[in-house]
């Protein structure tokens, strides 16, 4: 069995003795850790959902990691979050959405064929309205996933690293794949739950939770990245204010400038005809 030789490790870095600077709480940092370092232990591989997906425990106790092993050296300590988001953008924007689009297409193709040849009450089950509803939803989702995949990949291909868009794409693609596979299983009925070499849906059905969990679990991705980071990036001044706070020398002046600009923008929005019309409508609605 192939043994790992290098581990990419993200960790929260503290420097209480000020060995590399004045700050103690430096932040998330990424380092490359050789597996032959004393204290590193590589466990046996797991078998997630009975699939050939490489996964297993890695443990470390009293491991000494040289500062040269930090990606980017001392100059890049505390920059791990940006590194992780940039690295995850490829997996979230390319591999998992493409896998979801392909899996949904296969499920829709096989289910449509099955609904045509499987008969009940002397007619194909594809003529039943309930089956047609599921087939229609599956077909629409397949086209939707393929269009979204192409758009996201085009942005990445042009050099962009859209962290928020790729997070949205990963979450939406894997969740919609789950819906398509569930619809396919419903149409196949008992055929879909009988394990064997002729069951072409069972493996996909078991694999769906893996895509939902890896590269950032969807339940976390949706709340932390889509709403949290998305709101910060879309706001015209909030990200600049947060960045200014990281530099004590220019924080006060930058914050005053940004807050003044923010206040001016708010007054401009409040005095616009659309805002006044909305306020009047709200007052009339409340008075009623």
Give short role names for the model-derived ranges.
Residues 59-92, 109-126, 150, 268, ...:
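A glycine-rich, basic-preceded beta-loop-alpha segment at the flavin cofactor/substrate interface
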């Amino acid at each position: 069995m192939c043994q790992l030789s290098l581990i990419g490790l993200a960790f929260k870095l503290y420097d209480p003795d000020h060995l590399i600077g004045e700050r103690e709480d430096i932040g998330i940092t990424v380092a490359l850790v050789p597996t032959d370092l004393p204290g590193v232990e590589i466990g046996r591989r797991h078998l997630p959902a009975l699939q050939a997906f490489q996964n297993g425990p890695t443990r470390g106790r009293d491991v000494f990691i040289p500062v040269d092993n930090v990606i980017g050296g001392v100059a890049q300590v505390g920059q791990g979050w940006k590194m992780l988001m940039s690295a995850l953008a490829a997996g979230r924007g390319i591999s998992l959405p493409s896998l979801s689009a392909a899996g949904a297409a296969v499920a829709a193709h096989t289910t449509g064929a099955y609904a045509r040849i499987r008969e009940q009450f002397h007619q194909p089950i594809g003529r039943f309205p309930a089956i047609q509803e599921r087939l229609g939803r599956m077909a629409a989702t397949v086209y939707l996933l393929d269009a979204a995949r192409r758009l996201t990949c085009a942005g990445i291909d042009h050099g962009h690293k859209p962290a928020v868009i790729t997070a949205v794409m990963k979450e939406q693609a894997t969740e919609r794949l789950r819906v398509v596979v569930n619809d396919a299983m419903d149409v196949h009925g008992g055929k879909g739950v009988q394990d064997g070499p002729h069951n072409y849906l069972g493996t996909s059905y078991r694999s769906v939770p893996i895509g939902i969990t890896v590269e950032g679990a969807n339940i976390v991705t949706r709340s932390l990245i889509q709403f949290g980071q998305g709101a910060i990036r879309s706001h015209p001044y909030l990200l600049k204010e947060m960045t200014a706070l990281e530099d004590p020398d220019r924080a006060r002046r930058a914050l005053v400038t940004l807050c003044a600009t923010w206040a001016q923008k708010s007054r401009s929005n409040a005095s616009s005809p659309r805002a006044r019309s909305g306020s009047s409508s709200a007052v009339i609605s409340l008075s009623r």
